[in-house]
């Protein structure tokens, strides 16, 4: 196991949370599941699911889409963790030429289009279930970005700006259009997890289909397994985002 921790207040201060966090982290490493995790404020989180959500509170982390791996109160209780399939392998190679793009009102599509020649992969933080500007009459449609990325063999992984739940590209018209242009659903991965997984997928998988399977398949609990239509097949009737 690899257990990371820290504190909101320095160890030398009277009300520091550092001492208890360190004790809990050591106990989690000895008795908890053999995973990469974060121990903070008497909670053990799966590392690739956790988000820093607070700056000035002791409960600084959250894992909205994944149950806790452990709670450390008067008694410490731990989940069994992931079942390891086969021997562990350390994958050290990462493709660093990736970019995280957050959709925002008024985003000029020319900006991400200019990035495409410089990157090998793109993570798109979309609205809600995977929405983004689609109407070309408004001058800010991102659909040409997906088309150009596909032509350049630059995978685009779509994740949600919402912390809870995840992307379902089959749900609305814009998501279905992105799927038709080769976009990959990031499900309920955090943007950070999606970036690292994309970096690894690009480093180890040159074939487009193999890369897509890798990115959309849970490897170490970084995403919730979803039905196949959520990942790769546009719905026959998709709704317009409202």
Model feature map: region roles:
Residues 129-242:
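C-terminal non-catalytic interaction/assembly regions of soluble proteins
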Residues 18-21, 108, 142:
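Amphipathic coiled-coil/heptad-repeat helices and related helical stalk/stem segments
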Residues 1-4, 110-116, 126, 145-151:
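N-terminal small/polar loop signature for handling phosphorylated ligands or for N-terminal nucleophile
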Residues 1-10, 177-182:
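Glycine/charged-rich beta-loop-alpha catalytic/anionic-binding loops adjacent to active sites
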Residues 1, 31-35, 40-41, 95-98, ...:
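Short coil/turn connectors at secondary-structure junctions
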Residues 3-6, 37-41, 102, 125, ...:
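Short beta-strand segments
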Residues 4-73:
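Internal gly/pro-rich beta-alpha loop/helix module
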Residues 46-135, 218-242:
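Accessory alpha-helical/coil subdomains and C-terminal extensions
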């Amino acid at each position: 196991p690899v257990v990371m921790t820290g504190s909101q207040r320095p160890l030398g201060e009277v009300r520091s949370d550092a001492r208890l966090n360190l004790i809990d982290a050591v106990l989690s490493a000895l008795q908890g599941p053999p995973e990469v995790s974060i121990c903070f404020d008497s909670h053990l989180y799966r590392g690739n699911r956790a988000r820093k959500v607070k700056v000035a509170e002791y409960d600084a982390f959250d894992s909205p889409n994944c149950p806790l791996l452990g709670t450390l109160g008067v008694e410490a209780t731990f989940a069994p963790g992931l079942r390891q399939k086969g021997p562990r392998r350390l994958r050290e190679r990462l493709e660093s030429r990736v970019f995280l793009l957050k959709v925002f009102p008024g985003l000029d599509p020319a900006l991400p289009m200019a990035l495409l020649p410089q990157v090998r992969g793109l993570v798109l933080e979309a609205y809600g279930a995977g929405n983004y500007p689609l109407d070309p009459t408004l001058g800010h449609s991102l659909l040409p970005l997906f088309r150009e990325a596909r032509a350049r063999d630059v995978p685009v992984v779509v994740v949600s700006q919402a912390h809870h739940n995840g992307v379902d590209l089959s749900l609305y018209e814009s998501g279905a259009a992105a799927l038709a242009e080769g976009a990959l659903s990031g499900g309920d991965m955090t943007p950070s997890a999606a970036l690292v997984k994309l970096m690894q997928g690009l480093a180890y998988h040159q074939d487009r289909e193999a890369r897509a399977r890798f990115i959309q398949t849970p490897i170490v609990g970084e995403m919730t397994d979803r039905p196949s239509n959520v990942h790769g097949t546009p719905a026959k009737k998709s709704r317009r985002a409202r």
